[in-house]
Amino acid sequence: MGYQTIPSQGLSGEICVPGDKSISHRAVLLAAIAEGQTQVDGFLMGADNLAMVSALQQMGASIQVIEDENILVVEGVGMTGLQAPPEALDCGNSGTAIRLLSGLLAGQPFNTVLTGDSSLQRRPMKRIIDPLTLMGAKIDSTGNVPPLKIYGNPRLTGIHYQLPMASAQVKSCLLLAGLYARGKTCITEPAPSRDHTERLLKHFHYTLQKDKQSICVSGGGKLKANDISIPGDISSAAFFIVAATITPGSAIRLCRVGVNPTRLGVINLLKMMGADIEVTHYTEKNEEPTADITVRHARLKGIDIPPDQVPLTIDEFPVLLIAAAVAQGKTVLRDVAELRVKETDRIAAMVDGLQKLGIAAESLPDGVIIQGGTLEGGEVNSYDDHRIAMAFAVAGTLAKGPVRIRNCDNVKTSFPNFVELANEVGMNVKGVRGRGGF
């Protein structure tokens, strides 16, 4: 399926975006190995998260999925209650699922194979294989990419590990393995990354130690069931935040969005560019802060993106580059080589698409330079990347003509009702089927 977006006369209204994808992954995983029943409200029923649910069910976890209410009811099997799955666990398109499950499965008393779709089978896994091996895990793979064969070792040993780059997925993988390790596992990161795993461990009553740069867990503890309500995903909200910011006449409100400080890079950067964004009605539930976000149209200016904001914005850069494309002046983004090993090479995909829409965009080995200009209509390829597809749908709200985006099926991995909500606030997006994603 492809998308076609035509220029908007302005966005308006109030919407609630679906539950946070990162928190959904972690919540169901921890609930599955907790003792007792956990109800998860606001679970994201996207393909990536449902792949995690399926994997846990295949290992004996009882998970009732109430899809139309976005609710899971999880009967935890306890720390030692998982069973060997009957076949390889398919993580679909989800890098988060395969990396979190690798940490969980490294300390089990059985062997497992983790695999995924063709995109996932190109994603780098050396970053988790090396530290897990230091803990005593044995993992076979060809070329350090999936499929991964994990030979479970219930006698893992805790380690002190310095992450070479800020990565919430790697950090979380090692913390999960640390739950099953003898002694203490401590992870030090060079810059803050999203901390949902740490917050959820606390929510499930697991003791951990944390300072400014390090987080430690000791093995042998227990998780206790605890109901959780998942806030809206700021990565999904970001598409509407940018669309309203760049489209004249816009004013929208996004309700109950997660505003974890480790995820606020997109708001911080847009404000640096001149955006009119107001965050109100702060509450905190299940250790996670939530708020309403009001956005009005504003004229933007290009900026040099500070390195300390990169880990806080890593998933939102595709749509942030759309904002940069219509800002006055030049925007420079560096230190984001990680974007080249996402679902697709996001640097190359964004530069290619922006150039096709008339924007001067230059690819760097670790980033991009964009000279703000006027978006023209045209056709771009999402390269089967959900965030690229939605970013260019946002571009179409301000382009001089229709923007057509090819190969958008993977939007279902993170935002199944994107088109519905986009049209509700006036973005004029429609799905089109046919050759080449149209």
Curated annotation (Swiss-Prot):
Subcellular location: Cytoplasm
Record GO terms (molecular function): 3-phosphoshikimate 1-carboxyvinyltransferase activity
Annotated EC: 2.5.1.19
Signal peptide from the UniProt entry: none
UniProt-annotated catalytic positions: 315
UniProt keyword terms in alphabetical order: Amino-acid biosynthesis, Aromatic amino acid biosynthesis, Cytoplasm, Transferase
Binding residues annotated for 3-phosphoshikimate, in chain numbering: 21-22, 26, 167, 169, 315, 342
Gene Ontology cellular component list: cytoplasm
Residues spanning the membrane: none
Residues annotated to bind phosphoenolpyruvate: 21, 95, 123, 169, 346, 387
Biological or metabolic pathway of the protein: Metabolic intermediate biosynthesis; chorismate biosynthesis; chorismate from D-erythrose 4-phosphate and phosphoenolpyruvate: step 6/7
Primary residence: cytoplasm
Catalysis: reaction(s): 3-phosphoshikimate + phosphoenolpyruvate = 5-O-(1-carboxyvinyl)-3-phosphoshikimate + phosphate
Alphabetical list of SUPFAM superfamilies matching this protein: EPT/RTPC-like (SSF55205)
Top-level taxon: Bacteria
BP terms from Gene Ontology: amino acid biosynthetic process; aromatic amino acid family biosynthetic process; chorismate biosynthetic process
Function description: Catalyzes the transfer of the enolpyruvyl moiety of phosphoenolpyruvate (PEP) to the 5-hydroxyl of shikimate-3-phosphate (S3P) to produce enolpyruvyl shikimate-3-phosphate and inorganic phosphate.
The protein's assembly and partners: Monomer.
NCBIfam families in the record: aroA
Similarity comment: family membership: Belongs to the EPSP synthase family.
Name of this protein: 3-phosphoshikimate 1-carboxyvinyltransferase
